[in-house]
Amino acid sequence: MADRVNASQGAAAAPTANGPGGVRNVVLVGPSGGGKTTLIEALLVAAKVLSRPGSVTEGTTVCDFDEAEIRQQRSVGLAVASLAYDGIKVNLVDTPGYADFVGELRAGLRAADCALFVIAANEGVDEPTKSLWQECSQVGMPRAVVITKLDHARANYREALTAAQDAFGDKVLPLYLPSGDGLIGLLSQALYEYADGKRTTRTPAESDTERIEEARGALIEGIIEESEDESLMERYLGGETIDESVLIQDLEKAVARGSFFPVIPVCSSTGVGTLELLEVATRGFPSPMEHPLPEVFTPQGVPHAELACDNDAPLLAEVVKTTSDPYVGRVSLVRVFSGTIRPDTTVHVSGHFSSFFGGGTSNTHPDHDEDERIGVLSFPLGKQQRPAAAVVAGDICAIGKLSRAETGDTLSDKAEPLVLKPWTMPEPLLPIAIAAHAKTDEDKLSVGLGRLAAEDPTLRIEQNQETHQVVLWCMGEAHAGVVLDTLANRYGVSVDTIELRVPLRETFAGNAKGHGRHIKQSGGHGQYGVCDIEVEPLPEGSGFEFLDKVVGGAVPRQFIPNVEKGVRAQMDKGVHAGYPVVDIRVTLLDGKAHSVDSSDFAFQMAGALALREAAAATKVILLEPIDEISVLVPDDFVGAVLGDLSSRRGRVLGTETAGHDRTVIKAEVPQVELTRYAIDLRSLAHGAASFTRSFARYEPMPESAAARVKAGAG
């Protein structure tokens, strides 16, 4: 990339701002393949940061610099590139469009104050993008729509515009119309043509008059409806021509309020529309001063008064992304909400995920409060870091080698520690069991997983104590693929995916007696232990009870604990299909001992054998874990989801309306039927549904399903 960075925009000349009023933080969102990363290339060229654009297919773009992104030719992580236009610093936040990487999208939304919804002219709007628009509406985030890929063979601007308006509402109106190698401004009624990176202005052709007038009328009415001047509509309807400057002023206010959403067509390959888009971003989108800060608390959880987005206010910043680079080490991407960050200063680092979310992520992100020294500050241009003397309120920067700060942590003045309420991260719901291909790589695997979990809050690492498996909880197959790819290429660990074992359990269906006999007397010191036990089932959750009813010293007192130890060891191994036995009472009734050959080990073996014989004398049932799930699904897919849940042995508990044509389905489903549900639900509802899950209880597995498990264990 270095050969494409203009000399005047090189490492020593990163765009800077004197205060939050000179910053715009813009996140690009939309479907995968919509052209977000390529659009950023075109904007960087338009702002003369780059001399020419890079290519996704060639792996040369600014924002897709990760090895996995280059190989897969799609974004998998958040990236930031900044430019200066008309005296304003614009931080462009690129996010992945694929649903598996929604954690990166969430971080991008947190870092930004406004959003560009990027829609390809040959594709339209998908369901997750519609849901995201509703989410942004609920928090009042200012938005604009960019229709890209105007030069695609199947491009249809009119259809894409209609799809955006159908999905996002009637306040989505174009400011420009595409025309040949340029755009027609609907307010200025001028044609802007692009050639050799330059924009020229001329009068549109007469053949465009009708469509200009139609679109211009709708635009003007839309702007006037959002005007704070209530007399403007009356004057307009009375035939008065409203001055263009008045319309522009009202337009900019409505965009900043998040009540009007301009549409800008852009052809990234030719640069058409890039300057118009930058004008909307710098003049219409609000500065960080106009965007409310996240909720602020003390480390003890006490609400704190809202801080001003001001350079001189107390420091309040947040780590929105953490990466590990093999050459420069750990890099933290930080959004400054108030105050100023300077190099060689000490800040307080607070992480309080579990305080806010009940421990949901505390296994990989434990609560912590500690001081840390700031080293080198820089402004990111994708992977390239450009030195920063200071970072003002509202800006985004990169900080190298923060050893204690993790994604989601708050940085504040050590004299007045504060905590920002973390943004809500989606729970990873796809379990993938893995093992190091070579046993010698197990330590490297542990290190690599620890570092990846610190970087990615949507990745959860589980060391399952019952199944003895390492389980990655991921957002989907693509997310899991990137994790495995990174382990192999960054940490040099070859990993095998193995069959996931659901932690089933076994219990006795009825009372049974067992005789355990472990006798070996072939000369020398032998082994001698005999015991008789009775096994009784207990209610769910009762655990294990051991009773001693031996009379007459048939089993010497010192060996009775060994019988229990042997029973417990066999319970851990299972007596039916290799799963732990739970909820039983074992009563030691009788036994025999030898004055010389009896030993601790002999009675342990006798206890284990007695339990196995008791199991053979009665019915042993498998218990399976049941989860309660809550599925949020568009109404159009409710029938399909209900049918699918039924096929998974699910019991529907009820449904309720969630608004925005969505329904919540609550059901209980066996865990064994949910191992791929994150993938299947996405396919079933075209990516528009989501679900949560929580453990409910264990209950007997149906005999047909249990028989398949037993056959597999055999």
UniProtKB/Swiss-Prot annotation:
One term of GO molecular function: GTPase activity
InterPro entries registered for this protein in UniProt: EFG_II (IPR041095), EFG_III (IPR009022), EFG_III/V (IPR035647), EFG_IV (IPR047872), EFG_V (IPR035649), EFG_V-like (IPR000640), EFTu-like_2 (IPR004161), P-loop_NTPase (IPR027417)
Family according to the record: Belongs to the TRAFAC class translation factor GTPase superfamily. Classic translation factor GTPase family. EF-G/EF-2 subfamily.
CC annotations in GO: peptidoglycan-based cell wall; plasma membrane
Keywords carried by this UniProt record: GTP-binding, Nucleotide-binding
Coiled-coil intervals: none
Pfam families: EFG_C (PF00679), EFG_III (PF14492), EFG_IV (PF03764), GTP_EFTU (PF00009), GTP_EFTU_D2 (PF03144)
Any single biological process term in GO: ribosome disassembly
Other information: Was identified as a high-confidence drug target.
Highest taxon above the source species: Bacteria
PANTHER family: ELONGATION FACTOR G-LIKE PROTEIN (PTHR43261:SF6), TRANSLATION ELONGATION FACTOR G-RELATED (PTHR43261)
UniProt keyword annotation of GTP-binding present: yes
Chain sites annotated for binding GTP: 30-37, 94-98, 148-151
G2: annotated segments: 73-77
Region (G4): 148-151
Domain tr-type G: 21-289
Protein name, as recorded: Elongation factor G-like protein
Region G3, residue ranges: 94-97
CDD domains, alphabetized: EFG_III (cd16262), EFG_mtEFG1_IV (cd01434), EFG_mtEFG_C (cd03713)
Region listing for G1, in residue ranges: 30-37
Annotated region described as G5, given as residue ranges: 267-269
